[in-house]
């Protein structure tokens, strides 16, 4: 990838700069430490961080020591990984996976294999092959676009996700099984036999050209950093001699591809277990220090797609002044094309370009017939890299052989090249308060980028470009200029002229005024002068006082926010709307917040759908009503069913009626939706009646809810056949172990003669109520069609009652259905289930 090579190039360029006495060195200085973070309930530690107050520049020293400090502490909150997983399987680590992956023959719990730990046997293994493609783990690493380096693994490349997808190896000798996180994987070797050769009259030109080709947001924010993956040769004396010079560049490059891959969409990716743990440990109160540590370990992005292979790139440099004296000019003057330089690897030579390279060789201090450069190589055996640092002008076959040796090793030791990236915050999921943490990680990455904004640097002279490298600022100089501040040399040609302006850093955000905050910046780093260009962009910026996304999450997930930040005053439930409802309605809404109304299916809202909670705790509601648009059938049809079944029917549509359960229909069998939005004939004229039979069939036995009918007999259900049911704590008396069950499962295990006793809810950790999507609503909630999520039912809306149980509410026991109890719990009311059957008084009647 070009970004990485540019990162390494800057390190290479920095090695050949010298800091002139004309610019006084500026040493890096740390700012004071910030406050300690909240004590982490999992690690029992807290951290604090200090930022750079003054970046080192002009040869000054970098900051010493770490930006972070850690100490042990006593947490006030528990560890999120100790919580339950609802209806999913919980690995020993705390990570949750789908129950469909349990006992399928594949260890989908990445670190402990708990999903296969207690399986007596696996009747049908999900696949007959378990070998993944070689080096597949490379596709799951994080990536830091600021440093240009790969980081720790963020995607679980070992999980097959219960799938059996195979791919044939490139050499046709073997099959491999693909990870469930891989969308596509192809073994296709691509070797470009034609090398690419490019001349640049300065490192400045090279950076400008390559960043323009990248055309990405990070072209300037993420191009500059030290890298330890480069290989250089030459003594300290040679480096000191060359630091006082300005250079031209010849870049020779090529790539080798072994395989191509595309990762799945983020919502379908299973994150690596160590990364998942770190996400779980992140605080729900924004603390940049904690999120910054995650960025340091796992990067800013993850791999969306790319190739496994190797990249060969060598930079050859020539002193600009010597080149001018000896007649070696830029490619515009001597016009050596890529084809003209093939003589470096083939026997056919171009004398004009040979002379050009001989000039470069002599001016850059190379002796004999060897042309030395700086190899920037990714992939392949590192033992071959030293041989790639030079070209023998008299032995093109030897040059090609050394390259071929390295290229041949790429199949064994590939790296990811030609990668496409996606933001890391997309992978924040399957942890408590994931939506809040995702928003905070996005904010932290933006703040991290700001740390490397060149606005922190002092201006470079002669139009040089200031860049941030770790805790130091460096100047990238224009052609024929050099020095620590680019103060030496002379600008020539179209580079000469005035000084363009540069932005200073943004100010802090102002206090909140009329619902908005503002900040500003100045074009004075440096200010434009001598007809130089002014800065592009705005001098001021404004935003809402409260992040709208954060405010929405504060309502949907109030448990994710510190109690001191919670609103203190609320309006009661908003007024009801006939044939309509409030989207995402809670029991209480904070002052200043708004709710939005919507209409039932078959109705359209006329008027202003927004109501606001006023400061007087009264609802400010405009005129609105729901207007009927179609014919609607009632929810209860007394044994009748309709075909086709639809939420509503437009004018002219017909519906056919029939009866269920051996009943026969009396009255009209077909209804028409008329122009008045009424059924013709009327639905009340149709009804279902019992058929007269001479010999009624023998009645099937009436099974209990925890039983099922099999071969005309009632037998006990299995626990996995239970549907939606309330969670309770139960003690297994045979093992004296307390665990979480549901009311349905307790009835089932009792049916199987297992001795389980109901205990208090404080005796175990019950699964936290997770937000459900439509299609998975429990019996005490219903689907909100507007946002596709489940909301609490009203007590009168219970369609499936569940078991009759004994519940203590406000200190008094009463018998109610699971649905009724679930509605109370859904609405936040504290209840205690004292018996899984009706209360003793009612049971005795």
Swiss-Prot record:
SMART domains with a match to the protein in the record: CCP (SM00032), FIMAC (SM00057), LDLa (SM00192), MACPF (SM00457), TSP1 (SM00209)
Disulphide-bridged cysteine pairs: 28-63, 39-73, 42-79, 85-96, 91-109, 103-119, 127-164, 336-353, 433-560, 455-505, 457-473, 460-475, 477-486, 512-545, 523-535, 571-613, 599-626, 631-673, 659-688, 703-714, 716-751, 722-744, 729-764, 774-783, 777-790, 792-826, 798-819, 806-839
Region annotation CCP 2: where it falls in the sequence: 616-693
UniProt keyword terms in alphabetical order: Complement pathway, Cytolysis, Disulfide bond, EGF-like domain, Glycoprotein, Immunity, Innate immunity, Membrane, Membrane attack complex, Repeat, Secreted, Signal, Sushi, Target cell membrane, Target membrane
GO biological process: complement activation, classical pathway; innate immune response; killing of cells of another organism; positive regulation of immune response
Domain LDL-receptor class A as annotated: residue spans: 84-120
Region described as Factor I module (FIM) 2: spans on this chain: 772-844
UniProt protein name: Complement component C7
Organism from which the protein derives: Mus musculus (Mouse)
Gene label: C7
């Amino acid at each position: 990838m070009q970004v990485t090579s540019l990162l390494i190039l800057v390190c290479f360029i920095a090695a050949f700069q010298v800091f002139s006495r004309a610019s006084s060195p500026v040493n890096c200085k740390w700012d004071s430490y910030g406050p300690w973070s909240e004590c982490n309930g999992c690690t029992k530690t807290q951290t604090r961080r200090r930022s750079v107050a003054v970046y080192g520049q002009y040869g000054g020293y970098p900051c010493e020591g770490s930006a972070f400090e850690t100490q042990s502490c006593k947490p006030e909150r528990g560890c999120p990984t100790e919580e339950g997983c609802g209806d999913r399987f919980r690995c020993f680590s705390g990570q949750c996976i789908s129950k469909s992956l349990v006992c399928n023959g594949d260890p989908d719990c990445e670190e402990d294999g708990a999903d296969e730990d207690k399986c007596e046997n696996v009747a049908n293994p999900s696949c007959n092959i378990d070998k993944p493609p070689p080096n597949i783990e490379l596709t799951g690493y994080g990536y830091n676009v600021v440093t240009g380096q790969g980081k720790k693994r963020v995607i679980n490349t070992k999980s097959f996700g219960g799938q059996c997808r195979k791919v044939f190896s490139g050499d046709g000798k073997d099959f491999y099984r693909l990870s469930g996180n891989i969308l596509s994987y192809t073994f296709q070797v691509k070797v470009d036999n034609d090398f690419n050769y490019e001349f640049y009259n300065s490192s400045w030109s090279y950076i400008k050209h390559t960043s323009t080709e990248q055309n990405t947001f990070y072209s300037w924010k993420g191009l500059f950093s030290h890298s330890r993956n480069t290989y250089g040769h030459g003594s300290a004396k040679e480096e000191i001699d060359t630091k006082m010079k300005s250079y031209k560049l010849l870049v020779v490059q090529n790539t080798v591809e072994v395989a191509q891959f595309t990762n799945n969409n983020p919502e379908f990716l299973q994150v690596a277990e160590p990364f998942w743990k770190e996400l779980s440990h992140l605080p729900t109160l924004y603390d940049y220090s904690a999120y910054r540590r995650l960025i340091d370990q796992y990067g800013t992005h993850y791999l969306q797609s790319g190739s496994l292979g190797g990249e060969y790139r060598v930079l050859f440099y020539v002193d600009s002044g010597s080149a001018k004296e000896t007649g070696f000019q830029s490619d515009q003057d001597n016009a050596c094309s890529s084809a003209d330089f093939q003589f470096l690897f083939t026997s056919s030579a171009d004398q004009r370009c040979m002379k050009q390279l001989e000039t470069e060789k002599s001016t850059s201090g190379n002796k004999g017939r060897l042309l030395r450069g700086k190899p920037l190589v990714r992939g392949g055996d590192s033992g071959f890299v030293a041989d790639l640092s030079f070209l023998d002008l008299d032995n093109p076959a030897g040059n090609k052989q050394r390259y071929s040796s390295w290229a041949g090793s790429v199949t064994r030791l590939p790296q990811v090249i030609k990668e496409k990236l996606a933001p890391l915050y997309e992978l924040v999921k399957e942890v408590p308060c994931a939506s809040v943490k995702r928003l905070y990680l996005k904010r932290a990455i933006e703040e991290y980028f700001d740390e490397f904004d060149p606005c922190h640097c002092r201006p470079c002279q002669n139009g040089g470009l200031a860049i941030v490298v770790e805790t130091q600022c460096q100047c990238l100089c224009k052609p024929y200029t050099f020095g620590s501040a680019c103060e030496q040399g002379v600008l020539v040609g179209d580079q000469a002229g005035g000084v363009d302006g540069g932005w200073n850093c943004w100010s802090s955000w102002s206090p909140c005024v009329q619902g908005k905050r503002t900040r500003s910046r100045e074009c004075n780093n440096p200010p434009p002068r001598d007809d130089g260009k002014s800065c592009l962009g705005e001098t001021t910026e404004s935003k809402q006082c409260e992040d709208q996304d954060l405010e929405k999450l504060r309502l949907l997930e109030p448990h994710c926010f510190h109690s001191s930040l919670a609103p203190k005053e609320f309006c009661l439930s908003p007024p009801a709307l006939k044939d309509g409802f409030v989207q995402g309605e809670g029991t209480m809404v904070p002052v200043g917040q708004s709710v939005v109304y919507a209409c039932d299916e078959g109705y359209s809202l006329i008027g202003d759908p927004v109501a606001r909670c006023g400061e007087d705790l009264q609802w400010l509601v405009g005129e609105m009503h729901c207007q009927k648009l179609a014919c609607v059938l009632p929810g209860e049809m007394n044994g009748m069913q309709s075909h086709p079944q639809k939420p509503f029917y437009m004018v002219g549509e017909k519906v056919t009626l029939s009866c269920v359960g051996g009943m026969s229909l009396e009255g009209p069998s077909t209804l028409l939706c008329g122009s008045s939005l009424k059924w013709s004939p009327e639905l009340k004229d149709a009804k279902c009646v019992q058929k007269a039979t001479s010999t009624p069939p023998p009645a099937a036995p009436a099974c209990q809810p925890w039983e099922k009918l099999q071969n005309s007999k009632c037998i006990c259900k299995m626990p996995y056949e239970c549907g939606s049911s309330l969670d309770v704590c139960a003690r297994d008396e045979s093992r004296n172990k307390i665990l979480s069950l549901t009311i349905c499962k307790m009835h089932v295990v009792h049916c199987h003669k297992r001795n389980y006793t109901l205990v208090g809810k404080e005796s175990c950790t019950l699964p936290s109520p997770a937000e459900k999507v439509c299609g998975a609503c429990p019996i005490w909630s219903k689907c909100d069609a507007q946002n596709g999520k489940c909301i609490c039912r009203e007590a009168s809306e219970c369609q499936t009652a569940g078991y009759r149980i004994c519940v203590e509410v406000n200190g008094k026991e009463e018998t109610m259905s699971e649905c009724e109890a679930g509605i109370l719990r859904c609405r936040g009311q504290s209840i205690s289930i004292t018996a899984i059957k009706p209360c003793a008084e009612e049971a005795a009647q």
